[in-house]
Amino acid sequence: MTAPAPEWTRRAPVDLPGPEGDNSIARESLWYAYGRGDDRPEPPPWTWASTPPPDSHVPPGPPRPAGPSRVLPTGTTDRLSALAYPRVPAAGPAAPDALLHALAATFGPVRREPENPYNEHRPYASPRCLFPVHAFVGDGAAWRLLEPARHALTGPDTEAPTRIALTGRYTAIPVAYQWFRGSLVSIELGMVLRALSLGLELFGVPATLTPPSGGGAGPLRELGLERTWEWSLPWFVDVAGPGPVARAGRDAPVPAGDPSLTHVVRVDREQTYPAGPAPLTTAVPAGLPDGPVVPDWAELLWRRHSGRMPRALHGMDSAPRPAPVPARHLAAALAWLGVPPPHPVLAAAFDAVTVTAVVQHVEGYPAGVHRFERGAAHLRKADPTAPAGLEANYGYGLSPVNGCGIAKAPLTVFFSVRPRELFARFGPTGWGAAQLACGWAVHGLCLAAAAAGLFARPVRAFKEIPTKEVIGLAEDETIVLSAVVGVPRETGGDQLDLRT
């Protein structure tokens, strides 16, 4: 970004000068500083640093440990096809290969879309299909890398796997995202956590979840990751009871030339969860009715997508719909949003999240701004112009190379927090906990949309200050995450099935 002229008028406690004042990437670190008590946070010097364009970014190669590559079992899709949606199998002894099938159901590529500028697509969303969150699978002594594209586990031979470590790689995201890389990793960790919870649940594998406990980068070195500054501290999922507490260790220094990443790593290491392991609870709301669109879980995961455009165009479009969206689809979305994250700290952080939605063309609901609370939608302001107002304040508007269907979308959902309240209740841990909780919730919304024959696109590109005016948020609230729920447009493009 270009440094602005020195004189400017601050519109809110968190603001930047010049045309970049609504840039969500640049605003993120200011909200963190505001939460910690700075009433008028100033942008750090690296805000104005010149960075390569995102499209020039080449992600680093997989962090493969030494050792053989073992192919995962096939047949996961057939097993999911035999599970009627929305039913979840009753608890019982899991098959010997159940964990491996759950991993394939969570992380395995679903399809490739040749006309889409970003590929491949998994059961959960990821910006630019970068998938910065990696899974390592171990037996308590050694670890192997899960390589979804190769449908394999790579690394030293181990006993039967009992532990999964989830960690996000900051350097998988273009450096142009600067401090925002930390937020993208935390949000995607929440999405992955729900996707994995669902996979384990569908294959009958109970588990516990252990959050990072502080103490430094020792857990990353146990995974074989010596460049610890590239990675977030891992969350552990155990299928044979909670595993051992990882030893402490110091981080390797961040190389010169990326000052924002130094701050990202410091913030991640400050987020120390006070509670220990907790059961991995359900990812699926109870009492969902049978859906007329998807007969089984394989079809649901196939239908999840973020909106498509033809001819390699970017963005998304929401097609016209002759009849309103049935009320039952919004009721199901509310049910999915109401399932709390599995760990007590995450669940408490999600209680601090406000969910606001702009609704239109949905049976039984007036067009306007609604607040989603306790499984119900409460009208805050009748406003048929709100969808157009949102599109006008979206960072990637309609253009010859970009689609933008927000003005036509039946539902756009916003997850917001008050950073001061988060820090007062949880300390620095609240920042990441709220982001994980919002990622968990939005993946549920994505699945609800797929079950209704709709798409859901998680986004962070709304211009925050004018968007908050449209949906009625206070100046001390920040938008953690949004999702546009629209009607899929038929593009005529191929969808290559990559499932196993």
Language-model features and meaning:
Residues 1-438, 444, 451-500:
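N-terminal accessory segments that position/regulate proteins before the catalytic core
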